[in-house]
Amino acid sequence: MRKLFVFILLLLAVAVSAQTDKAFMTVDWGKIKAEVEANPQRVQQLVDILINVDADTTLTAKDKILAVYGRTYLNNGRDLLMEFDMSKARNEGKFDKAAAIADKVLASNPLNTNAIVSKIYNFRILVDKEPDKSWMLSDSLKVYSVRLSRILDTIFMTGDGSKEYPFSVTAVGDEYNLLQFFLGIFKVNGQSVVGTCDRLVLGETNKNYSSPDIYFDVKRVFEIEKSMFNSQGGDGK
């Protein structure tokens, strides 16, 4: 899979280099939730533009943040259980099965980064197995790679990875996908919860990210997981 990592990193290199010495926009969850409740159709329209490989240039940074983070209030984690099954299949090396489940996950939440990665994994394998179809598969691979790039670029806008300004995520998978496919960091030596943040201790650094640890704001992740637990009959305590 290292070849795949290198492939995607090449696609994302321009996005990373363009954000050197960036300014960032922290996520105002209360404001985003209010905007979703007031106009859910607009949020969905922004999502549709974001995932359209030919249309994203019309979106401002604020629009992208509203799309990526507002979408969670439209879906409320309904894709989470399917994502568990998908990740299990992928970890077992059943990439075709994972890709099939990923289609269902993306039908529920088109911004699920783990599902997008599962599709990319499978397309990359098929390109090697079926070279006569590589032109068609490469087009599909590009579509999902661009979508992943846009989502991760939006996450990257929300902080600098410090405890004071953590990157905001809506799923744990976003953390590792940002590390691997956007920052090019593959080694993590440890993880801990610090307040409402996940802190990852890194086993390597590079020119894209030089700090020894990285923080992610997981407030929304906790809310989604609690909501799912309650819907499954838990007491939420």
What are these regions (language model features)?
Residues 4-5, 141, 191-194:
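Residue-level detector of intrinsically disordered/flexible regions characterized by low predicted structural confidence
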Residues 4, 9-12, 123, 224-226, ...:
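Residues in flexible loops and secondary-structure boundaries
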